[in-house]
Amino acid sequence: MDPILLGGIVALSTILVLFSGVSVALGLLIVSTGFLLIFDGLRSLELIPEILFGKLDNFALLAIPMFIIMGSSIASTRAGADLYEALERWLTRVPGGLVISNLGACALFSAMSGSSPATCAAIGKMGIPEMRKRGYPDGVAAGSIAAGGTLGILIPPSVTMIVYGIATETSIGRLFLAGVIPGLLLVGLFMAWSLYSTWKSGDQQLLSSRVYTWKEKFEILPRVLPFLAIIIGVLYAMYGGIATPSETAAVGALLCLLIAVIIYKLWNPKDLWVVLRDSTKESVMIMFIIAAAGVFSYMLSSLFITQAIAEWI
């Protein structure tokens, strides 16, 4: 069979399997195993366990569970609420201040967690109800969180960049560095548009009637400083050549857990167990996808689909 036609059948089969509700990793394994059985026979199946293990036998993968623990431990506390409240106090009289507060809190939380879903959940829990109370349209409230949540993919430490770096054998440190300027640029553009659109509409009811004193503005800053220190410390350790991304992730995870326990009183073993359990589930899910993608890639190469597409292009 023509490899290009076979590639189209593989792509269609993958889409159908994934749309059937099967998990991504299992879907990739089903498609890969099926096509290998049909075209290569039973002998090819002997290599699947070796490929699965080989894809996971990578020191760089240690960064994934560590950064996920960072995000889970922070998301289980009031850290997101504190970030949001601090920005809201300083920007309360600025047109579109709540939207800007949402975006700023999302950017900072993304730099701590590296996860878009965790960012949306932590900041949206506080931001959306407050914006509704102030009179913002639901679309603006949800849109600010959705836009800010996407920053978790760009702003380091990004779990998505780690997975991409491992899959393409690209330097994770360089990927992180490449995401800093685009991430900050997006934050700035989002904030500038929010300020302009609110100012142009002239809707004064969106401004808070409460005016915070300088004392109230400064007294909340100590709650935010530990997280800023972690962000700066993690980035400095990576780009200063002090530690690798995996080693930095381990230190960051430990510091975030200590902050969650000491500052936010996360003493209850059940709460800590929930953090570790959720982190483990998410880590295993991502690792399984990476391993299954390795088998899928082997199948494409074994059936000469990759080579045929490269020549055709």
Question: Each PLM stretch: what is its role?
Answer:
Residues 1-313:
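Alpha-helical transmembrane segments of multi-pass membrane transport proteins
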